[in-house]
Amino acid sequence: MSTAPITDSPTSVAASELRRAPLLAAVDSLAELFESNGRQAELDRRLPQAVADAMREADLFWMKTPLELGGSELHPLHFADVMEQIAYHDISAAWATMIGNGTTGVMAGWLPEAGADDLFAGERPITAGQFTPRGVAVPADGGYRITGRWGFGSGIGHANWIVGAAFIEGTHDILFFTAPKSDATVYDVWHVAALQGTGSNDYSVDDLFVPEHRTMGAYGATSSRTGHCFRMPISIFISNEISPMAVGIAKRAIDDMVDLAKSTARSLTGVGDLIDRVPFQKAVGQA
């Protein structure tokens, strides 16, 4: 029996904390790139390729991917720390990163071994899509023939794989699947008032054969991965992804408000800048 301290385990919280450090440093180094491209992302209605490429180089799309497949396999709280920091600089970049991490993490963590091998066989996967069952999967020899159309494919512009969900024909059973993006049709429909840069377009597949090893049941799926993160249900695995982004943009709003208050005078009161007013200081403190 091993007597090594539990902190020496690659799946320990302490080990995850060590892997978090370079990711946070990478986000800091990309801060100017995020912020200088934010407006362009809104105009293009997708992340600029330069931003997506930089995040790829910084390994920011594989924070929830198992160690065995080259991912960071961060503890949920450490993943939240990184997501909060990205959102502080650019919420659209954070949203696309969140989707890529969650969908890749689910597929890498719960697909059969052969399916994960397919996913990681070539260029490292950046996945996009969602798991609402908007399709039908017809059983076929060795897999399923899937037809459906899904919305909110955030990050699909820079992705190379898609994920989706479908009801198995004639049942209420839900199937998750993944396929190369080249097998799907993408629809340019993302004309919205906010989060334009996420590029959350629709996508579809039509009678696409997906081998069984690239599918998994939505309920009761078990993972063969060794990390603690993959012992929890999929719904819990992805449940911490949105809240840290809300914290990040809230912190940015407070900081921007304080900066604005430093140069905003209240001439009617005879007081100088807004930053000097006690009610304002109290409100910032409460926030």
Regions found by a protein language model. Give the residues of each.
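Alpha-helical interface subdomain recognition
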Residues: S2-T65, G71-D81, P244-A287
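Glycine-rich flavin
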Residues: L47-E57, W62-A159
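Short Gly/Pro-enriched turn/cap motifs at secondary-structure boundaries
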Residues: P125-T127, V192-Q196
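Generic beta-strand structural signal
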Residues: I126, P133-G135, G142-Y144, N160-G164, ...
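Short Gly/Thr-rich strand-loop-strand
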Residues: R134-V136, D188-A194, D202
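Helix-rich catalytic cores of soluble enzyme domains
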Residues: Y144, W150-G153, G164-I168, L208, ...
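DPxDG-like acidic metal-binding loop motif
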Residues: R149-A184, D188-V189
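Glycine-rich beta->alpha junctions and the first turn(s) of the following alpha-helix
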Residues: A193-A194, S200-A287
